[in-house]
A protein has these predicted regions:
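S-adenosyl-L-methionine
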Residues: 71-119, 124
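Conserved SAM-binding loop of SAM-dependent methyltransferases across substrates and taxa
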Residues: 51-63
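Short loop/turn motifs at secondary-structure junctions
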Residues: 40, 64, 112-113
Length: 124
């Protein structure tokens, strides 16, 4: 039987090999593969987005037609961020709905709202 450390190392190595920022990407991939939460063209809010791996997965799933807004207390660095990604450094619990929705930019169609809200954080 493998140890917890070996399992952790497996997912860490997989994340590195596939170019994800962290192994947490596989958690969202697993959830979305089973539940089909994120669709092409969706507008996604990732609350507590650091280090950014859920944003990476969400961007792949929404395609160019969709948009992803990530907010976190920590700065999330992104080299050559796509135009359909907006990263906000701030407190999700203090952010106004308007400031989050502004992140949708030109992807604001129909009712101005998010189709999916993701979070892998603990708020306290």
């Amino acid at each position: 039987m493998s140890s917890d450390r070996e399992v952790w190392d497996h997912w860490y190595r997989q994340a590195q090999a596939q170019g994800y920022r962290s192994r947490a990407a596989f958690k969202l991939i697993d959830i979305d593969d089973k539940r089909k939460v994120i669709r092409k063209g969706d507008r996604v809010l990732d609350a507590g987005c650091a280090p950014g791996s859920w944003c990476e997965v969400a961007l792949q799933r929404v395609g160019l037609e969709g948009a992803v807004v990530g907010i976190d207390l920590q700065t999330v660095e992104w080299r050559e961020a796509p135009t359909n990604l907006r990263l906000i450094e701030g407190d999700f619990l203090q952010a106004s709905a308007e400031s989050l929705l502004e992140g949708l930019g030109s992807h604001r169609r129909g009712p101005t709202r998010f189709d999916v809200v993701l979070s892998d954080m603990m708020a306290f």
